[in-house]
């Protein structure tokens, strides 16, 4: 899908041309960022996450952005570990322009060549088809750096950036966003006090073929289910059949939560879920989505016969996923041992009208009753480790209308308004704390493999993302002024 930005007639031709001209240097900037393995989930990589924050701050300062690194203190679950800072930035103080808060994150998921990557994940590789392969290219270093590239393009084109920008870049998004909500509350009437809207680019199109702008996200409730049977692992030959085994209980409980067709088996969980209208169903079937895109390039087997049913399952209905069962004893013995303690991990994605507190009560009650019915001698502990409610935003606001027009300007097509099956807790935090409209602006594709091996970004998409940012700010300025005139 080619860009038509240079022919958009929106007054940004010089900016668009400069983006194309600077493409090589922009790829080199991304290459430098990918080299830094800023994996927030690993304590041994924390120094690299800090190094990434300093690198971004340096790049921003070179472009004239006012930068502050806000310390977030110690990590809640690892008090000896320092949290990476929020990188806060400010570009522009013009009262004749809107002020847009841009959120992104500079940490990434773990990656290693032995995981099955085609290339070293920490070395940016350009494939023959122009796709950029490397950890963070699509999530979220690529989209983040796109904003810096946009500023540079405006500067070198001799054109003013159409809006004031406030940046909020975090380094713990892939590991619980520890400290972020508190920081937002602290800065709501300080660093963020004069913002007009929020823009988050940590989302993707509904398919490689169908451009979209999501206005809703599912919520998430994450559980740790611990079953303890002994103080240490035991040999199954010596103690099998003699002692109570945690794995037996764990498998029984985990398998009772959801069936093989994806139906959640916890009673009452669907009671408040909104029904899907006939119009919605028909519109979902009309979307231009290939089977590969619908399945995110995973090669998975779909549970649904129609595209509409698949999208409804992702956007409009809750889901329960079993993630893993872990032996809680590090370096536990042979594969035939009986684990002393197990931790089962699962999560529930929630949709509009579902309340996390109510769902948690249903889940806790169901699991405890199920465990009681087993007559087990083991001990059970249920920990709701994390929860965030669903998010839904008005697309009538000038923030969304600016993004819709910008997509038309750059890509030459009308984006469809959709929802996302994933969860971005920070979107709801921004909406609740700052009381501003929050835009979800996609610049990537579902087959980019953001959290999987061979994570990549489409080369043309990366360049058009920069153009999209600029056009979005241009349209935002126009619509903001109109809204102030008619207010």
Q: Where do the model's predicted regions map?
A:
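Acidic/His- and Gly-rich active-site-bordering loop/insert found
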Residues: 2-137, 156-161, 346
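Short, solvent-exposed loop/turn segments at the edges of secondary structure
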Residues: 84, 119, 162, 194, ...
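Beta-strand segments within the central parallel beta-sheet cores of soluble alpha/beta enzyme folds
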Residues: 70, 162-170, 197-199, 266-271, ...
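Acidic/histidine-rich catalytic neighborhood of metal-dependent amide-processing enzymes
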Residues: 131, 136-216, 481
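Acidic-glycine-rich active-site phosphate/pyrophosphate-binding loop
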Residues: 114-127, 218-229, 405
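Metal-dependent amide/peptide-bond hydrolase catalytic core
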Residues: 2-11, 206-208, 222-465, 470, ...
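Acidic, glycine-rich active-site loops and adjacent beta-strand->loop/helix elements
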Residues: 106-108, 168-177, 201-205, 229-231, ...
């Amino acid at each position: 899908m080619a860009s038509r930005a240079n022919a958009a007639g929106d007054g940004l031709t010089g900016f668009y041309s400069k983006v194309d001209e600077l493409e090589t240097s922009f790829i080199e900037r991304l290459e430098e960022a990918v080299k830094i393995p800023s994996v927030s989930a690993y304590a041994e990589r924390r120094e690299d996450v800090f190094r990434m924050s300093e690198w971004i701050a340096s790049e921003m300062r070179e472009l004239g952005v006012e930068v502050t690194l806000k310390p977030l203190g110690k990590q809640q679950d690892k008090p000896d570990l320092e949290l990476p800072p929020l990188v806060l930035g400010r570009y522009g103080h013009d009262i004749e322009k809107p002020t847009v808060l841009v959120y992104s994150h500079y940490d990434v998921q773990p990656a290693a060549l032995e995981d099955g990557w085609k290339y070293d994940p920490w070395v940016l590789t350009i494939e023959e088809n122009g796709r950029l392969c490397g950890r963070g290219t699509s999530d979220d270093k690529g989209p983040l750096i796109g904003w810096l590239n946009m500023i540079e393009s405006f500067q070198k084109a001799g054109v003013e950036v159409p809006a004031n920008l406030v940046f909020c870049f975090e380094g713990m998004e892939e590991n619980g966003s520890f400290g972020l909500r508190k920081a937002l509350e602290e800065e709501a009437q300080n660093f963020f006090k004069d913002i007009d809207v929020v823009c988050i680019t940590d989302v993707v199109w509904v398919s490689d073929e169908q451009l979209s702008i999501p206005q809703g996200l599912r919520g998430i409730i994450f559980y740790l289910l611990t079953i303890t049977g002994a103080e240490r692992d035991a040999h199954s030959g010596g103690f099998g059949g003699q002692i109570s085994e945690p794995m037996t209980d764990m498998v029984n409980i985990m398998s009772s939560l959801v069936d093989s067709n994806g139906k959640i088996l916890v009673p009452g969980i669907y009671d408040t879920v909104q029904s899907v209208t006939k119009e919605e169903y028909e519109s979902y079937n009309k979307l231009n989505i290939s089977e590969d895109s619908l399945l995110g390039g995973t090669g998975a087997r779909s549970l649904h016969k129609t595209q509409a049913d698949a999208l409804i399952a992702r956007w409009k209905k809750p889901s329960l996923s079993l993630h893993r069962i872990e032996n809680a004893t590090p370096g536990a013995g042979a594969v035939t041992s009986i684990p002393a303690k197990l931790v089962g991990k699962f999560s529930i994605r929630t949709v509009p009208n579902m309340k996390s507190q109510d769902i948690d009560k249903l889940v806790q009650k169901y699991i405890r009753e199920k465990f009681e019915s087993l007559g087990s001698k083991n001990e059970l502990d249920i920990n709701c480790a994390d929860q965030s409610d669903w998010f839904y935003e008005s697309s009538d606001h000038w923030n969304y209308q600016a993004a819709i027009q910008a997509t038309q300007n750059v890509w030459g097509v009308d984006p469809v308004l959709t929802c996302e099956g994933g969860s971005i807790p920070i979107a709801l935090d921004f909406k609740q704390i700052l009381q501003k409209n929050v835009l979800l602006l996609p610049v990537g594709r579902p087959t980019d493999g953001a959290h999987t091996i061979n994570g990549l970004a489409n080369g043309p998409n990366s360049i058009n993302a920069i153009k999209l940012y600029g056009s979005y700010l241009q349209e935002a300025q126009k619509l903001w002024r109109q809204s102030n005139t008619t207010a």
